[in-house]
Amino acid sequence: PARCRRCGTCFGACPERVISFANYNIDQIGSMIREVQVPKDFKKEGPRILILACENDAYPALDMAGMRRKSWSPYCRIPVRCLGSVNAIWVSDAMSKGFDGVMLLGCKYGDDYQCHFVKGSEICNRRKENIAETLNRLGVQPERVDQLEVAIDEYDKVPDLIDGFVARI
């Protein structure tokens, strides 16, 4: 506990959902996902996607894009402490709820990493690969769940990232 940075990356690995913080826990995000009203008409509304966005870079980039009157396909966005905190249960809840895709939008990782918690986006990418294998076994196209990277100052790219994801679905 003394070395905990409160990033939540342990959430994504915990199958029992017992790890929590006072103001952030697995069930809280799961409840947000389950309470979203998903449009019924795919043909009329287009693909229904959920965006789980890192609150450090991606979520502020989404907000800045909106403040600058950028436009993109409608969607629902939910902030997460770090993409490393994304639990497969959240993706499962979203797909069960009727979302056509889940976009994981976070900080850059790899050699040019910008993750505030260093490995969060990288950990999420590994978990996304496991989710893709599970979706494939269930007969669901694994590309319905994708992870994309954005820096806080790349808000002008956000509409293209979202529209590109929607087009792939």
Model-derived regions: residue spans:
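Cofactor-cradling patches in redox/metallo enzymes
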Residues: 78-156
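C-terminal functional segments of enzyme domains
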Residues: 150-169
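Iron-sulfur cluster-binding cysteine motifs and their immediate structural context
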Residues: 1-32
